Amino acid sequence: MDTIQRASHKALIRLLIEKRRASGMRQRDVARKLGRTQSWLAKIESGQRRIDVCELCDLARALKFNPDKMVAKIARIAKQE
């Protein structure tokens, strides 16, 4: 199965969106903070683009959350796939 279709990837995206919304930031704000475009983040959040671990760490820094906890949650979901 393609990574983008996996439950673990969908959970990752859902968690990232929750973190961004909780921070009160818009896609444009986060992207600008990372030197990226809003469309880059929109593609990630819509599941059209995979995210690598370095990008996850960048997003975690921008949104001020611990990526370790998120990865642990995703790993638990991935074990069930």
Role assignments for model-derived ranges:
Residues 20, 30, 41-44, 59-60, ...:
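Hydrophobic packing within well-folded, soluble alpha/beta domains
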Residues 1-2, 61, 69-81:
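Short, charged recognition helix plus adjacent turn
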Residues 50-52, 80-81:
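Short, solvent-exposed alpha-helical "recognition" segments
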Residues 14-33, 58:
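Short basic helix-loop element that most often maps to the first helix and adjoining turn
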Residues 35, 54-70:
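DNA major-groove recognition helix of helix-turn-helix/homeodomain DNA-binding modules
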